[in-house]
Amino acid sequence: MANVRTHKGITPQFGERTWVDDSAVVIGDVQMGEDCSVWPMTVIRGDMHKIRIGDRCSIQDGSVLHITHASDYNPGGWPLILGDDVTVGHKALLHGCTIGSRVLVGMGCTVMDGAVVEDEVIIGAGTLVPPGKRLESGYLYVGSPCKQARALSDKEKTFFKYTAA
């Protein structure tokens, strides 16, 4: 596949039943779990650090997933890690961050370097999660920069596996 590219001798790896649209590009040190989907015009670029994506994740149209390279400012760099049952909404940007399991990243969100999103979180559309910020499990976050808005309902918590499937 021309849209799956080896970089520095490392070729992306995909679990069973994972689908990548022909217009999406996956480059380098990327490992995706089973039953994932990567939708049109998405870029997943593991060029200077690793990207790990769990099972049953949906990476929607136009999203950009990238790492943070090592530098004097950040000697180790930051990988990009996604847990299981994660939905990344249309045109989201995830950069060198860690996303737990059962998370909805809303459309147009930006999650920056070193941020950590715990399990069972909803990040509202257009939200900015600044560098190094930690989002506590069980809450909705909104705004730029993000703020904790309210606790998630039990119904919302059951919705994660549906949206990612």
Sequence positions of predicted segments:
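Glycine-rich hexapeptide-repeat left-handed beta-helix
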Residues: 1-14, 41, 47-84, 90-165
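Thr-Gly-centered strand-to-loop micro-motif
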Residues: 21, 46-47
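Extended, small-residue-rich solenoid/repeat segments and analogous flexible loops
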Residues: 1-35
